[in-house]
């Protein structure tokens, strides 16, 4: 962010000479010195000095200058009506934006108009639809560091646009990163003791008032919102949640009660262990929410193929269920039963879908209502949504699944609120309240009387044209009205002789004169007075209606949650029915999948080959070999995705599946480096591997792909073997390990709870043909040269590779080979010594870290 966004030093020195308006501007820039202040001047938001230069550059608007008695200021401005895209550009550039609106009517004030910051827009607290960019949650998070070594971290998350609020305590920085990867907040507010730079890659990081993180202040704020000091039992959670609430209030501008988020009444305290845990690496590798691989999935993520939801509420709920799959068997079974019932009743499911399409995003509507920013169309959308609720409840009337029964009971259509809105708000209200015509006739007698007066006056004016034509004999006489001169009678200059004496000239045109009469002026005053009073009364009535609706915010949020769950379950059922998914059996001693398929790849590639999987307590570690492109990575991801789907409550793409509940899914799949962090592919791989080996349990699912390939072959093989043995002997996790180290297949044969699987291929005249079918046993060939040829490597290179592959003996100086140099012989001698030492190492007794240390020591002795 620019170092100075307020007045330059020279200007600050002579601030007493500033005009009142510029003094007001600079006072706001001092108060909101961490933001760009958009300062309303008439129909524009304007910025001055360094802030203007910054905004002009980012928003690509013209930089001009404002001149007054104190000098010239650089100035940039954007129209208020089209400000949102410019605000979005400033947010994307890393700025907060403080919006300072005029809070007085300029026509009613002598002197400078008062202005106040009405909202501070930040990446994590935007609520405008134009800035949110979709139905997904937009979280702001707060992170509080523990006051001592054992306190850990407190993490709180809030979606200001919906009211979703979560809090948890996390033991260390790694767990913090896992949760940030799971929720992907747009903004992270950090407290004292937290190194903001360490989380700069996770979100837009914002430092905030240290006092907001103080336990006493945080405890008071949490109790004020959520009704008790024991809602969050640990100090770390309290500090994070209290500071987050304070920050959310700060972004609302104003002061006191005007800042309060009245619709926020519930915080969900959770432990990560209550759900299937997946860190950011696993979420990316499995492509749950964003597609990042290049194996033909056409940019499609898992959430995309599952999303048959009818409304925004359902889309967010489905995303949340994938983000946080269940680990409680009863809860999983409840979702499966509900999905099964909807699969079996396609007519009801389709009717549900049709009704749910008429459901608006009432979570965000309730948020706008409670913040006093909802317009008449928002209230009409609420009423229309509440009208759908009885229809949805009726379709669930005969449901047997207990999940559907509980959702049916939660579907409250709030008859008093719906009735109020139907009586009060017209069916198709205008966008702006100032346009009038928002409140129905018959709702308020006073408004009806004013409208009657207005209509009668306008009817008199309409009749006036006919009567004056008859009176004057001028057929071309017209009665009109404009915003400057009001009502008038227009007579062409050719008919000036027919103008009566009581006409009073109001305006002269080139070919006509415009007049008024005393009676027309009197009627005009009556009409204008009635219009203004009606407009004021209509606004007053609307605000009262909006406040009454806001009082029911908690009930409407409960309805929103129920509708969201129904929509997500119906989406799961629609996908299951359309694509032949099966209800998994949860329990047993492992993962048994018959005819499993990858739900994304089968939809984006033709000829997908289903595969079976059997892993249990007797066969927990599968070593998978086979050529590149044969399907190893897809197969491993497929198994993990099926587990995730099952625990999210969805049916799975398979002929049959019996699955144990897993606590975590870990992945080390694909090569990646961290250029910005200065970490090589191998270092990133080892860091991810270390995290897996520390955190995995015997209830976890682990996917490993090509461990150790970022270093020398001997080192990589040793690491891969050590990891395999450690997982088998010490961790006990269900593991799929794809490798090109064929030496690992001997370990799989040797280890009692391991097995070999392979993907076969056949050579032909046109190259290698992949079967994409998993088979028992180890692969007998890697087909690397054939894959290179298939990929288009030039034929001379492929031919030379075959020669080298077929003649390995030449490297030893045999017939036809070159004689080894003295250096080469010396290296062989050193290598022989290292090999001898390796033979003496008891790999089974080493921890992974000890194994890495041994390798590091040996590697350091190799020139």
Swiss-Prot record:
MF-aspect GO terms: ATP binding; ATP-dependent DNA damage sensor activity; damaged DNA binding; double-stranded DNA binding; mismatched DNA binding
InterPro entries registered for this protein in UniProt: DNA_mismatch_repair_MutS, DNA_mismatch_repair_MutS-lik_N, DNA_mismatch_repair_MutS/MSH, DNA_mismatch_repair_MutS_C, DNA_mismatch_repair_MutS_clamp, DNA_mismatch_repair_MutS_core, DNA_mismatch_repair_MutS_N, DNA_mismatch_repair_MutS_sf
Residues that span the membrane, as ranges: none
Keywords linked to the UniProt accession: ATP-binding, DNA damage, DNA repair, DNA-binding, Nucleotide-binding
GO BP field: mismatch repair
PROSITE patterns: DNA_MISMATCH_REPAIR_2
Binding site for ATP: 626-633
SMART domains xref list: MUTSac (SM00534), MUTSd (SM00533)
Similarity-based family: Belongs to the DNA mismatch repair MutS family.
Function: This protein is involved in the repair of mismatches in DNA. It is possible that it carries out the mismatch recognition step. This protein has a weak ATPase activity.
Protein known as: DNA mismatch repair protein MutS 2
Species name: Halobacterium salinarum (strain ATCC 700922 / JCM 11081 / NRC-1)
């Amino acid at each position: 962010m620019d170092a100075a966004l307020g007045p330059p030093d020279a200007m600050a020195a002579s601030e007493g000479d500033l005009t009142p308006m510029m003094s007001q501007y600079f006072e706001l820039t001092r108060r909101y010195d961490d933001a760009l202040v958009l300062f309303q001047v008439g129909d524009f938001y304007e910025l001055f000095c360094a802030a203007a230069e910054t905004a002009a550059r980012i928003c690509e608007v013209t930089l001009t200058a404002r001149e007054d008695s104190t000098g010239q200021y650089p100035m940039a401005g954007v129209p208020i009506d089209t400000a949102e895209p410019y605000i979005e550009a400033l947010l994307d550039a890393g700025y907060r934006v403080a919006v300072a609106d005029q809070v007085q009517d300029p026509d009613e004030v002598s002197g400078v108009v008062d202005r106040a910051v009405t909202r501070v827009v930040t990446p994590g607290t935007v609520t405008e639809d134009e800035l949110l960019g979709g139905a997904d949650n937009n979280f702001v998070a707060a992170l509080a560091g523990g006051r001592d070594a054992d306190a850990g971290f407190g993490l709180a998350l809030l979606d200001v646009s919906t009211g979703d609020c979560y809090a948890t305590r996390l033991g260390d920085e790694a767990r913090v990163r896992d949760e940030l990867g799971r929720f992907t907040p747009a903004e992270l507010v950090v407290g004292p003791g937290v190194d903001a730079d360490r989380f700069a890659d996770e979100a837009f990081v914002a430092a905030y008032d240290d006092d907001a993180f103080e336990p006493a202040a945080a405890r008071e704020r949490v109790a004020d919102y959520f009704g008790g000091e024991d809602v969050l039992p640990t100090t770390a959670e309290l500090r994070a949640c209290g500071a987050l609430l304070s920050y959310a209030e700060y972004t609302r501008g104003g002061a006191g009660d005007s800042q309060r988020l009245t619709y926020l009444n519930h915080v969900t305290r959770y432990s990560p262990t209550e759900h299937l845990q997946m860190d950011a690496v696993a979420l990316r590798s499995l492509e749950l929410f964003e597609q990042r691989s290049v194996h033909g999935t056409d940019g499609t993520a898992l959430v995309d193929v599952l999303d048959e939801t009818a409304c925004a509420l359902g889309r967010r709920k489905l995303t949340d269920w994938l983000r946080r799959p269940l680990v409680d068997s009863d809860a999983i079974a409840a979702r499966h039963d509900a999905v099964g019932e909807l699969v079996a009743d396609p007519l009801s499911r389709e009717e549900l879908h049709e009704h749910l399409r008429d459901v608006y995003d009432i979570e965000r509507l309730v948020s706008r209502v409670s913040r006093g920013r909802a317009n008449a169309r928002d209230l009409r959308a609420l009423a229309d949504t509440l009208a759908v609720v009885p229809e949805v409840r009726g379709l669930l009337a005969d449901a047997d699944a207990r999940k559907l029964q509980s959702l049916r009971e939660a579907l409250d259509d709030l008859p008093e609120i719906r009735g109020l809105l139907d009586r009060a708000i017209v069916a198709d209200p205008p966008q702006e309240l100032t346009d009038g015509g928002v409140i129905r006739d018959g709702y308020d007698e006073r408004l009806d009387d004013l409208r009657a007066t207005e209509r009668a006056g306008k009817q008199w004016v309409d009749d006036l044209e006919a009567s004056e034509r008859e009176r004057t004999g001028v057929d071309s006489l017209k009665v009109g009205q404009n915003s400057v001169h009001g009502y008038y009678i227009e007579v062409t200059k050719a008919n000036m002789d027919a103008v009566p004496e009581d006409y009073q000239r109001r305006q002269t045109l080139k070919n006509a004169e415009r007049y008024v009469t005393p009676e027309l002026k009197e009627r005009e005053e009556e009409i204008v007075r009635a219009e203004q009073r009606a407009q004021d009364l209509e606004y007053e009535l609307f605000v009262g209606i909006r406040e009454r609706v806001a009082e029911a915010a908690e009930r409407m949020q409960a309805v929103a949650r129920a509708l969201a769950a129904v929509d997500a379950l119906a989406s799961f059922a629609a996908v299951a029915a359309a694509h032949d998914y099966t209800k998994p059996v949860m329990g047993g001693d492992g993962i048994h999948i018959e005819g499993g398929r990858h739900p994304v790849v089968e939809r984006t590639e033709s000829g997908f080959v289903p595969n079976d999987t059997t892993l249990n307590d007797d066969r927990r570690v599968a070593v998978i070999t086979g050529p590149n492109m044969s399907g190893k990575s897809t197969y491993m991801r497929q198994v993990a995705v099926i587990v995730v789907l099952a625990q999210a409550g969805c049916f799975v793409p398979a002929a049959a599946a019996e699955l144990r509940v897993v606590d975590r899914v870990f992945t080390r799949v694909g090569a990646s480096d961290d250029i910005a962090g200065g970490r090589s592919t191998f270092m990133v791989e080892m860091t991810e591997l270390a995290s897996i080996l520390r955190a995995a349990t015997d209830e976890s699912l682990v996917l490993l792909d090509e461990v150790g390939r970022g270093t020398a072959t001997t080192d990589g093989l040793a690491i891969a073997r050590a990891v395999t043995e450690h997982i088998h002997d010490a961790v006990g996790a269900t593991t799929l390990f794809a490798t090109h180290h064929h030496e690992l297949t001997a370990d799989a044969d040797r280890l009692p709870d391991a097995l070999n699987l392979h993907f076969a291929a056949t050579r032909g005249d046109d190259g290698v043909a992949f079967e994409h079918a998993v088979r028992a046993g180890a692969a007998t060939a890697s087909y690397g040269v054939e894959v290179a040829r298939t990929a288009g490597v030039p034929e001379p290179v492929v031919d030379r590779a075959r020669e080298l592959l077929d003649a390995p003996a030449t490297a030893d100086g045999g017939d036809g080979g070159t004689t080894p140099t003295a250096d080469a012989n010396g290296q062989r001698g050193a290598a022989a010594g290292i090999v001898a030492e390796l033979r003496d190492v008891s790999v089974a007794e080493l921890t992974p870290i000890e194994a890495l240390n041994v390798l590091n020591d040996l590697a350091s002795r190799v020139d």
